Structures are given as C-alpha cells and as structure tokens.
Amino acid sequence: MEGPEGLGRKQACLAMLLHFLDTYQGLLQEEEGAGHIIKDLYLLIMKDESLYQGLREDTLRLHQLVETVELKIPEENQPPSKQVKPLFRHFRRIDSCLQTRVAFRGSDEIFCRVYMPDHSYVTIRSRLSASVQDILGSVTEKLQYSEEPAGREDSLILVAVSSSGEKVLLQPTEDCVFTALGINSHLFACTRDSYEALVPLPEEIQVSPGDTEIHRVEPEDVANHLTAFHWELFRCVHELEFVDYVFHGERGRRETANLELLLQRCSEVTHWVATEVLLCEAPGKRAQLLKKFIKIAALCKQNQDLLSFYAVVMGLDNAAVSRLRLTWEKLPGKFKNLFRKFENLTDPCRNHKSYREVISKMKPPVIPFVPLILKDLTFLHEGSKTLVDGLVNIEKLHSVAEKVRTIRKYRSRPLYLDMEASPHHLQTKAYVRQFQVIDNQNLLFELSYKLEANSQ
C-alpha cells in the first residue's frame, strides 16, 4: 500500500475506526477482547503514522478518542471496582431517585430483593446481566446464613409474580431479568412444590383512597419534571439498543436494558394517571384531576415530550377511567375539546398520520413516542429479509440507518428547563421519579365501579 493510493486506503480505514469508536464508546467495554483488538489496531496505526505524514491528524484524534472511551484491559486477578446503581424503585430511597440517571450496562451491579413464599426476602448484590442460575446461587448463599431451615434453599426456582397474581417461571439460562420485570412484579425464589401457592406482595394490592401528592403540585412543575426525567432516560438509551431490541428480541436483552427501562417508565406513567384518578373519591375533585392531567399533557406537548404526552393521554383513555361518565360531564367544555384533539393526535389510524405530522415540524430536543419507533423498525425488519440470495439487503439496512439517524437528530441539542425556581422543586422531583401505581386492570375496574356503578 505504498504511495498516494495506499495512504488513501489507510485514511479510509482509520476514518471508519474513528467513527466506530465515537458511536459505540462505552458499549465496547461490555465486549470481551474489545480492548485488546483496539489496542492492537492503535499500535499498528502508530507504526504507519511515522511513514505517512497524512495520518498524523487522524492518529491524534484516535489517541484522544481511545482515552475518552477508556478501553482498559483489566489485569489478571484484579476485580473491577464498580458502584452499585439504583433501579427505578431501589428501596424507595429519596437520594437514589434524585440522582441523574446514567446508562446501565450488563456488567453494572444493582441491589435486588428476592422474596420467599411467606413474603420474607433476602437482598442480593448482582450484575444487571446475571442469569437466573446466578441469582439463585446468590439467594442460596444468603439463605445458608439465615435462621431458616437448611432445606429451604434446596431445588429453588425463580418466579416473576405480578400484582395481579400472574406467575412466570424463569429458565436458568435467562439473563437480565431485572429490567424485564413488570411495574409491580417481584422475583420469588421457591421450590416447585410451593409454586402454585405464590401470591403478590400485600402492599401491591392495598389501596388507600384520599388526597395524594398530585393534588398539591402544579401542572407546570409536574410536566417539566416528567420531561426532564424522560430526557435523562432517553439519553441513556444507545441508538444500537433500538436495533438490538427489534433484530435480536430476548437474545439481546443484555444490550437493551436502558430501552427496557424507558418502555417500563412509559407504562408506569400511564398507570399513574389512571391510579390517581380512580383513588380520588370526591366527584368534584376527580373532575379537577382530569382537568389537571389534560393541562399536564398539553404542557408536555409544549415541551416536545411526546412520550409523556402519549402516556398521560393513554392513562386518561384507560377503560376504567373513560367510563366515568358523570365525572367527565363535570369537565368544562374547553377541556373536553382539548382532550378530543389530543385523542385525535394519538389516534393510530393511517399509520399515526397526525402524530407524524406534528413531530416532523419539531426541532430538537425532542422526546418521541418510543414504542412507535420500535413499531417502525419491526415493520422494516419483518417486511424484508436481511439476506437475499446470500447477499446483504442494502436497501433494508439503509432504511434502518435512516430511522437511527432520526433518533440521533432528536437528541442533537441539549434540553434546558428552569425548574429550580419552584419552592417545592426537590419534593416534586422525588414524587415524579417514584410513582406509586396500580397496574392490575381488574383492580382499577373495581375502583371505577365503586365510584360510578351505573356509568355507561
């Protein structure tokens, strides 16, 4: 590769490596051997840099990028020092929920409670990507030092139990189960004999009607904190996670932890809206609450936070809420008309035409309705083969890349919201980041019928 042609090829290879490192950065630390490969490439490039003066500028950029990415090769017998990261409901600790969200990686460590059939629990420290077998091993180790009978840890299985009592037996080879849990689901370790007797935790089905925090906060504060939090979560999702989620499904769960959490949060906000409305017993206050949520939806749309906007509207459209005819009749006509416009905007007819028209006019920063992005990618993936007659379907990959570039555009500018001027800034922030919700639709309907038994 001597001469100008050789230099051009080397520059092209170096440019591709720079783009690769810039795009994937921290993800490379999750791949075994990535550090060695990049180091070997870097040393080879340094050799050529002395022969080709035209490589000097790109080599300097590579050196800076490698330092930024921090591709460190761990020494033998030297365990890495990691800080334990909190999940959404990490023991309801205020200090945890106020922290700025950072991206999760499979090797990150978290605390988790694993429950027994009698609702006692053990707390384990585990990697986010830990397999079911690893989790059960940690539980067994904990139980050996408890005062429980020694036979209790024999032949344990791991089960995810939802608030409605639905049980999912997890297979030993499954991994990253923490981020795949439902909103109010918990992990239970038990023997096969006690599987059928598992019931949800009592606190997940206890309901205490009355005024809650939502009645005391301003719509502007709630909308701004929703947008700020969801921007943090959206920024944590690497663009590759969208592709892995669709192309690899459950096999790529380790690589899609942040996306799983964002989707879970969207569902959580939807159930939060329904929960707050249905826990409000006074008809007048309930109508005021509908009005407040419509205001919050409008402000989220104004903030270009379409994820929160969609979630709030879907919460108000929950069948247990929408059937409250007497409550909706108390709503002023202005807000009824506004909500109809919001329903039209979220209407999926004609491939979400109304939504697409609105978001196409927005300039970054934008928080899109993420499930629709996944729907579009799924259509691209399932609508055509990746390989055709043994050749790569370039047209399909170009379409996927265009969708990824759109995601990148939404995040191309920082988000600025002035929230600290509010006297209850931290209180509202804590409230918004750790919603208490009912995700059991049967229970929501029970509450709805208690409020208005004969509504049509």
UniProtKB/Swiss-Prot annotation:
One GO location term (cellular component): plasma membrane
- Keyword Ribonucleoprotein in the entry? The reply is no
Give GO terms: molecular function aspect only.
guanyl-nucleotide exchange factor activity
Q: Where is the Ras-GEF domain?
A: 218-454
Q: Which InterPro entries match?
A: Ras-like_GEF, Ras_GEF_dom_sf, RASGEF_cat_dom, RASGEF_cat_dom_sf, Ubiquitin-like_domsf
- Please give the PROSITE patterns that the UniProt record associates with this protein: RASGEF_CAT
Pfam (any one): RasGEF
Q: Which CDD domains match?
A: RasGEF
Please name the GO terms of the biological process aspect recorded for this protein, alphabetically.
Answer: Ras protein signal transduction
Q: What is this protein called?
A: Rap guanine nucleotide exchange factor-like 1
The organism encoding this protein is Pongo pygmaeus (Bornean orangutan)
